């Protein structure tokens, strides 16, 4: 090996020093920051929307329809839904010190004020809140008041319209936000008018209109809740909080009314917490099942409807009071009431002509029940031949109609025959086809009459046909159906028994001058002891082709002029209603036109998961009057 030269040794040494210096410098140099990384800007994720509080209420079925002003639509569910989704000028508050158990207070969410502003003529001015609107954003206005008045006066089969019959005009002021209502006379019960106001701009244009357009729908509403869906097949009604409501919002977001099913199924549903509130028909066993569930509150309450059997005394065969009395005497009211109630151990019999069992001053005034022998004796005294031989005869025929549904059935075994001049006494009982309870009661009544020899049939009709064409054409001799309970007694008396309620008088048209109607004109009073007077044979036709005609509301077809002054005095407040009832009640029984049967009664229950449910509300609205305040716990 050679020895390295000096030059090479120097180069190696210098290189080593340079390398060492670089390493030292590298160790002292600050490291550069890492390259920036691409990252997403953090965002706050909003929480999911809170599910609306849903309360489920068990019911029997959704009912025949949703117009609260029609006799054929009266039902507990309709009363409840209407109170929750429709605006009212005044609302009922429980008060046992009043004749009907309710006092009526102004609804401040709809009205700014409602006052009597003139006594000559009697005038009430309603000031509507500017923000009050329907769910389609249309304003709630005086036009809606005008429309309801016109319909209540001109449509047949409405609920006790005597108060509306006194109105002579409804004026719209302040851009529709003020309704000035003028009456023909003072009317102390004016606060009970304009409840459950309907959206005129919708109802007048939907198919069927006021009379049948709301049979399965409430497309536009104006209350704390709106109708989300109606499912007749499943018997369900879904109502939801009305987001356009201008007043305090409801606490429940959703209330689902649904069919409860059999008593055992309802008890299981309440026990498991699937159903929180219930209002159903049922007997003592169903009530006991619900009452036995821990922390479940139960009660029995009456609903705002009573069932009656009404004879049409203007029909020639029923013109004789004794014949009517005999027919009503042949009916077993206890059995009819059991059929109407759906049970035989929880029946609330109605045994008065004017007051209902729910009225604080109610006492039974019905005369003692008549025996069948006594009833048949009255028929014999009226010229009928009573044959008690058992025979088989075909079911009696009824007038032909394309709109009828007749329960004729197979030939009946008749234990007798009641006839006059060789013709058997017939009786066609009309009933609304959409009301299965009334149909069942009517069929039972027909069975009882056929059993003694009266050829009775049931004619189930569309409600519009029943209360208009069938009455005008005398196609029915009697009617079985519901009447309202819990309303003003003087109005009830005038609507159902008054002589003016038989007349077809004119109503001012939309643009016609509003003048007070003339006194009703009727035939000369009869000399018969009961002073019963039939209506004119034909309605008077209006001279103005644009005028409307009042629809008679007295379904009996006659009136007693000897008590008309008392009826008028009760209506205008110059006589105490209690004194008037004492005076006229015996006369109404003597007329033998109306047989009260029962007041509808239901079981109500509230589970522990819902607070603020009152089981004793005002009769017209039931337990849902405060549903906007129901609170579901645990949410």
Swiss-Prot record:
Disulfide bonds: none annotated. It comes from the Bacteria. One of its GO terms (molecular function) is peptide transmembrane transporter activity. Keywords: Lipid biosynthesis, Lipid metabolism, Phospholipid biosynthesis, Phospholipid metabolism, Signal, Virulence. InterPro entries: SBP_5, SBP_5_dom. Residues 32-52, 389-412, 511-551 are annotated as: Disordered. GO terms for biological process: glycolipid biosynthetic process; peptide transport; phosphatidylinositol metabolic process; phospholipid biosynthetic process. One of its GO terms (cellular component) is extracellular region. Transmembrane segments: none annotated. SUPFAM superfamilies: Periplasmic binding protein-like II (SSF53850). The keyword Coiled coil does not apply. Residues 390-411, 511-531 have a biased composition (Low complexity). Pathway: Phospholipid metabolism; phosphatidylinositol metabolism. Residues 1-26 form the signal peptide. May directly or indirectly regulate the accessibility of the key branch point intermediate, monoacyl phosphatidylinositol tetramannoside (AcPIM4), to the elongating alpha-1,6 mannosyltransferases which could regulate the lipoarabinomannans (LAMs) biosynthesis. Belongs to the bacterial solute-binding protein 5 family. This is Probable monoacyl phosphatidylinositol tetramannoside-binding protein LpqW.
